[in-house]
Every structure is written in C-alpha cells, then in structure tokens.
Amino acid sequence: MTIKVGINGFGRIGRIVFRAAQKRSDIEIVAINDLLDAEYMAYMLKYDSTHGRFDGTVEVKDGHLIVNGKKIRVTAERDPANLKWDEVGVDVVAEATGIFLTDETARKHITAGAKKVVLTGPSKDNTPMFVKGANFDKYEGQDIVSNASCTTNCLAPLAKVINDNFGIIEGLMTTVHATTATQKTVDGPSHKDWRGGRGASQNIIPSSTGAAKAVGKVLPELNGKLTGMAFRVPTPNVSVVDLTVRLEKAATYEQIKAAVKAAAEGEMKGVLGYTEDDVVSTDFNGEVCTSVFDAKAGIALNDNFVKLVSWYDNETGYSNKVLDLIAHISK
C-alpha cells in the first residue's frame, strides 16, 4: 500500500522530507501547502545550497508541481482547516510549518480530511512524541503525533543503548548545532532570545534546547535524569551531540564502544551508526542515520563517568525519520 502524504510548510524540513520521499516506494507526496507560489516552490526544490540539485525533473503546470511526471497539488491556505486533504486522498500530513504544534491546531488537518498528522518538531502540549530507535513500539494508534526534534532523535537512541546496558544515573548534553533558519545573517532584533539575534556567521551562540529533557518523554526511565544546552555555530548543516553521563554499572570505554557497535549493527541499524574513522562534520552531510557514534571522539574519566559523541545531519536524518514515523503510524 502506498501512503499518500500532504506536506504543510515547504521550508527546510518540508523540502528535505519531499526529497527523501522520492527514494521510497511506500510513500507518495500528493499535495503541498505553502504561501510560496508554485514557480518559486519549484525553484526551491530544484536547487539547494546544502544538499545540491534535486535528482529528478521539476516543472510547473496550471499552478501545480509536476515532479518526475507526477502531479502534486499546490495550495496556499493560511488555515489548515481549509485544505481539503480528502480531495487528493491524503492519509497523513507532515506538519512542517513550525506553527501548528499542538493537538488543537494540528487537528485542523483532520477536519480537512486527513487521517493522521505527524508534527515535524517537538509538540508544545502533551501530543505524544515518537523517536525511531527509542519508543516506536509504544505507539497506540493516536491520530496526531510528533517526531520530536532532530537533536532528540540523535540523543535518544544513544541514551537508550547506554541506559539499557549500563544504567544512567544522570547526564548533561551539549549539542554543537549548525545554523538554522530562525537565526540572523547579521545582528538583528530577537526580543525573546537576545543572543539568538546576533550574526549567525560571526559567532558561537549559546542557546537553550529542550532536546535532552524531551528524551524523558520518549524514554520515561530517563525522565529527570538528563538536561542540556546548545551552541549554535557558523556551519550550514550537520550537528554533534556531546553526552556526558554518570553510569550505574562500571564499564570501560571499550565496553561502551562494543555495546553501541552491537546496537548499531543489530536492532538499531539505520537509526544508530558507529564509526572509528577520523571524521568531521561535513562527512555526515546526507546521513540518514539520526545518530552516528564517534568512537574516537569520546573519552572516559573513569569507569563511571564518560563523555560520548554522536553526529547527525539535522536535516536529512530527521526528515527520513519523519517518513519512517509516517509509515509506522500507517500500518
């Protein structure tokens, strides 16, 4: 069965979700809603400064996109309730505007005829969050779910492996995070986050993130045990998590590496990766795993206190897991 998907919001994540869907036989994008006009939408899809040219044909006909010969309905509705998803048979909406992140607001997609909705960001209410490699097995048929954040998608699988094998007493996370669309090219007004208004290409910017606390929502056994912060850095894509934890069960760094490697080659294949190469951030541009453990970068102070490092393409990895969640809730 092919799952018919509508995308609301054609920004960074909306477009990368679209690109990733072209490589899957189980998912078909049938509609896109954004306030951009179709010609500009086609241009934004064709050319990407980070991920290169679109691998396929993109045309515009009668105000709609024709991608690889298939028509995709284009609309420009501000209110999701008016989207008439049922007219094009949409099963699941990828809600990628960053605006409709509660059950109440996202439910407008259901009103408009969609069966289910996946939020491509952490929910702002109690809408359940699901992370592949952490808690997909806890899905119970809810019609609106969240794919959490890109950083939670990196942290949760690694934290689960460490906690399952050695037990986490407590931990702190830092994500060294690539620039995102909310930042400023030069210093500009940012009333809620003064540091966040400083020029993105000129600064390392400390920032808050709910990613570590959100792990406690997808892995309740870690609730209250993790928190963290972010440094925004002047790179266009690919971020890295630094997780420093105290372990219940003593373990050498070699034992930790072995446990992560076993998970990466076993039950978490395709989610958690493992490398012993001398890698840097650009080596992960286009990486579909949401967390790639860097065995050489981590360090242990002793057998109970360790720093672990894991890379993620905050656009590609996350967008691929949005599609995995869409497929999972459509079974």
UniProtKB/Swiss-Prot annotation:
Alphabetically, the GO molecular function entries are: glyceraldehyde-3-phosphate dehydrogenase (NAD+) (phosphorylating) activity; NAD binding; NADP binding
InterPro entries membership: GlycerAld/Erythrose_P_DH (IPR020831), GlycerAld_3-P_DH_AS (IPR020830), GlycerAld_3-P_DH_cat (IPR020829), GlycerAld_3-P_DH_NAD(P)-bd (IPR020828), Glyceraldehyde-3-P_DH_1 (IPR006424), NAD(P)-bd_dom_sf (IPR036291)
A GO CC annotation recorded here is:
cytoplasm
Known pathway: Carbohydrate degradation; glycolysis; pyruvate from D-glyceraldehyde 3-phosphate: step 1/5
Q: What residues make up the catalytic site?
A: 150
Where D-glyceraldehyde 3-phosphate binds, per the record, is at 149-151, 180, 209-210, 232
Location within or outside the cell: Cytoplasm
Name its GO BP terms in alphabetical order.
Answer: glucose metabolic process; glycolytic process
UniProt KW Nucleotide-binding keyword: yes
Q: What main location does UniProt list?
A: cytoplasm
Amino acids binding NAD(+): 12-13, 34, 78, 120, 314
Its EC top class is oxidoreductase
Q: What is its EC number?
A: 1.2.1.12
Q: Where is this site: Activates thiol group during catalysis?
A: 177
Give the highest taxon in the source lineage. Answer: Bacteria
**CDD domains on file:** GAPDH_I_C (cd18126), GAPDH_I_N (cd05214)
Would the keyword Oxidoreductase be found if you checked this record's keyword annotation? yes
Its transmembrane ranges are: none
* Record PANTHER family: GLYCERALDEHYDE 3-PHOSPHATE DEHYDROGENASE, GLYCERALDEHYDE-3-PHOSPHATE DEHYDROGENASE-RELATED
Q: How does it assemble?
A: Homotetramer.
Protein family: Belongs to the glyceraldehyde-3-phosphate dehydrogenase family.
Q: Please describe what this protein does.
A: Catalyzes the oxidative phosphorylation of glyceraldehyde 3-phosphate (G3P) to 1,3-bisphosphoglycerate (BPG) using the cofactor NAD. The first reaction step involves the formation of a hemiacetal intermediate between G3P and a cysteine residue, and this hemiacetal intermediate is then oxidized to a thioester, with concomitant reduction of NAD to NADH. The reduced NADH is then exchanged with the second NAD, and the thioester is attacked by a nucleophilic inorganic phosphate to produce BPG.
Query: Could you tell me what this protein is called?
Result: Glyceraldehyde-3-phosphate dehydrogenase
Which species expresses this protein natively? Salmonella typhimurium (strain LT2 / SGSC1412 / ATCC 700720)
The lineage is: Bacteria, Pseudomonadati, Pseudomonadota, Gammaproteobacteria, Enterobacterales
